[in-house]
Amino acid sequence: MKIKILIPVYNDWQSVFKLIDEINHLSITSDFQISVIIINDASNHDRIDKQKEFENIQSIKILNMKKNQGHSRCIATGLKYIFEKEEFDHAIPMDGDGEDRPEEIIEFLKQIKNSNNQPIVGERVKRSENLIFRICYQLHKLITITFTGKSIKYGNFTCLSKDTVRKMIKEKA
């Protein structure tokens, strides 16, 4: 099964290559072929070129945005790119700043068989935002529960099937 990990980056190349190194050291079974797509959001700092070979990562590609467009646009661009140009079964967008734990990839991969092509959502357990952000976020969750009756735990850290990516691209979700 081919897995594409999408990592947006703006200037923080050191963190991205640290994350890739951590992904490389995960105990991933041979059932999965891991590739990384870095989406460079028009960084104005020089990229740290790592010529290191990663034995558990099949390939690393860098897509360069022409201008800085932000994290969400980078993920959307990466998803569109892999849908149109790459062979894959699932995509995992990740933050390159260390907020998403690479160990959770193992949990995603375990859940793929039972996911029925539905998105698998990771929940951040460690947040580094300030107190005001956390209070507002809790208020947002309370309002959501009040109006929908459901607790929605969602972030960018997801595992998306190719079918889900296709729907997102075709329907411009």
Where are these regions (language model features)?
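Short, well-ordered alpha-helices that flank and scaffold nucleotide-derived cofactor binding pockets
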Residues: D21, H25, K80, E84, ...
